[in-house]
Amino acid sequence: MAFAKISQVAHYVPEQVVTNHDLAQIMDTNDEWISSRTGIRQRHISRTESTSDLATEVAKKLMAKAGITGEELDFIILATITPDSMMPSTAARVQANIGANKAFAFDLTAACSGFVFALSTAEKFIASGRFQKGLVIGSETLSKAVDWSDRSTAVLFGDGAGGVLLEASEQEHFLAESLNSDGSRSECLTYGHSGLHSPFSDQESADSFLKMDGRTVFDFAIRDVAKSIKQTIDESPIEVTDLDYLLLHQANDRILDKMARKIGVDRAKLPANMMEYGNTSAASIPILLSECVEQGLIPLDGSQTVLLSGFGGGLTWGTLILTI
């Protein structure tokens, strides 16, 4: 039986930093209001780079670290809700940029759960025995999706990309997973046109900015997602005490505080970086993972047992437990 492992990690963020003080110059807000409610103090914003540009930088870093060329890749899966275009896919643009002419490439849309869903999907490709190497990337330019006059959402999000190189392994690394969706609660987090421009339709295109019912999403995370994480651990071959780190979607520092208590783990096992990057949706978990490797918390030698969990629009939520 074939197994998969994460062999390399990388991330990339745009150069421009926008602080809470900067936002206070263009909207009715201040640093204390934002940081006390979210933990966020700044975010990176793309001036000219597209989602595929950010993802391409990550892909190049991954290949350089592994010492491989694009021609050695079998697939590219790119998780995003801010694609360059609906067609072609952002993943296809990345494929062309890095010369991965033998790889199939596609986008996956599962909002802030996107990277977890994409990594789970990629693991199945490797486990089939037909594929040996692939890139899994989360990339977002959310600065293009928010209404910059709406302080309830604009202050939360940032741009960035992160990803992993997934390769075949002789040993098992993926220990447990849980992927979930609940479309009946889809209206609490929306982005994009809900209507159509067509002479054959009576529908009108609705406002396309990202919209969120913050309280509902907050309650969903600390209730449903925490319960799902606990259940995934209970059904896995490990105990909660075996987890070295839990890398959760970086939406809000207060959510992480409550999740740690609900799951029954020390808050120190939940690293955070939303104070530097804001909420980068599908990019948040791979950026955090890459930083943990850079800081030496996760040596990338298979010695650490790590839980990854994303949650967001759809509603969607997903958890993976693996050794890294």
UniProtKB/Swiss-Prot annotation:
<dbReference type="Pfam" id="PF08541">
    <property type="entry name" value="ACP_syn_III_C"/>
</dbReference>
<keyword id="KW-0012">Acyltransferase</keyword>
<dbReference type="Pfam" id="PF08545">
    <property type="entry name" value="ACP_syn_III"/>
</dbReference>
<comment type="function">
    <text>Catalyzes the condensation reaction of fatty acid synthesis by the addition to an acyl acceptor of two carbons from malonyl-ACP. Catalyzes the first condensation reaction which initiates fatty acid synthesis and may therefore play a role in governing the total rate of fatty acid production. Possesses both acetoacetyl-ACP synthase and acetyl transacylase activities. Utilizes short straight and branched-chain acyl-CoAs, with a preference for acetyl-CoA.</text>
</comment>
<keyword id="KW-0511">Multifunctional enzyme</keyword>
<keyword id="KW-0963">Cytoplasm</keyword>
<dbReference type="InterPro" id="IPR013751">
    <property type="entry name" value="ACP_syn_III_N"/>
</dbReference>
<keyword id="KW-0444">Lipid biosynthesis</keyword>
<keyword id="KW-0808">Transferase</keyword>
<keyword id="KW-0276">Fatty acid metabolism</keyword>
<protein>
    <recommendedName>
        <fullName>Beta-ketoacyl-[acyl-carrier-protein] synthase III</fullName>
        <ecNumber>2.3.1.180</ecNumber>
        <ecNumber>2.3.1.300</ecNumber>
    </recommendedName>
</protein>
<feature type="region of interest" description="ACP-binding">
    <location>
        <begin position="250"/>
        <end position="254"/>
    </location>
</feature>
<comment type="subunit">
    <text>Homodimer.</text>
</comment>
<dbReference type="InterPro" id="IPR004655">
    <property type="entry name" value="FabH"/>
</dbReference>
<dbReference type="InterPro" id="IPR013747">
    <property type="entry name" value="ACP_syn_III_C"/>
</dbReference>
<keyword id="KW-0275">Fatty acid biosynthesis</keyword>
<feature type="active site">
    <location>
        <position position="249"/>
    </location>
</feature>
<dbReference type="GO" id="GO:0033818">
    <property type="term" value="F:beta-ketoacyl-acyl-carrier-protein synthase III activity"/>
</dbReference>
<dbReference type="GO" id="GO:0005737">
    <property type="term" value="C:cytoplasm"/>
</dbReference>
<comment type="similarity">
    <text>Belongs to the thiolase-like superfamily. FabH family.</text>
</comment>
<dbReference type="InterPro" id="IPR016039">
    <property type="entry name" value="Thiolase-like"/>
</dbReference>
<feature type="active site">
    <location>
        <position position="279"/>
    </location>
</feature>
<dbReference type="GO" id="GO:0006633">
    <property type="term" value="P:fatty acid biosynthetic process"/>
</dbReference>
<keyword id="KW-0443">Lipid metabolism</keyword>
<comment type="pathway">
    <text>Lipid metabolism; fatty acid biosynthesis.</text>
</comment>
<feature type="active site">
    <location>
        <position position="112"/>
    </location>
</feature>
<dbReference type="GO" id="GO:0004315">
    <property type="term" value="F:3-oxoacyl-[acyl-carrier-protein] synthase activity"/>
</dbReference>
